[in-house]
Amino acid sequence: MARIAGVDLPRDKRIVVALTYIYGIGNATAKKICADAGVSEDVRSKDLTPEDQEKLRTEVDKYRVEGDLRREVSMNIKRLVDIGSYRGIRHRRGLPVRGQNTKNNARTRKGTKRNR
């Protein structure tokens, strides 16, 4: 089982799909990583040679993924909350941040209805 960026990649999936199990790597980035590493997109992760795994690790290390990315996102949200911006207040209250209507919708963000 290939382990890249602290994540065990699934063995039976194509490497492009397996790379998307890493937080911060989507489909387009996975394809770019495979192209830059010179690894075929159709190869299964169980069939990777140790050299291919090392090439992929080197390419993935160039991106901000997993813990570093999660930390950066949470620090960005914390900064918005600390400076008291509108977006920070919406985060603090658990409401939609990007201008969505909340009169009838946003049940996921607001939580379940309480009887009034």
UniProtKB/Swiss-Prot annotation:
Example of a GO biological process term: translation
HAMAP family hit by this protein: Ribosomal_uS13
Region (Disordered): 91-116
Species this protein is from: Lactobacillus helveticus (strain DPC 4571)
Protein known as: Small ribosomal subunit protein uS13
Physiological role: Located at the top of the head of the 30S subunit, it contacts several helices of the 16S rRNA. In the 70S ribosome it contacts the 23S rRNA (bridge B1a) and protein L5 of the 50S subunit (bridge B1b), connecting the 2 subunits; these bridges are implicated in subunit movement. Contacts the tRNAs in the A and P-sites.
GO annotation, cellular component aspect: cytosol; small ribosomal subunit
Encoding gene, per UniProt annotation: rpsM
Keyword rRNA-binding: yes
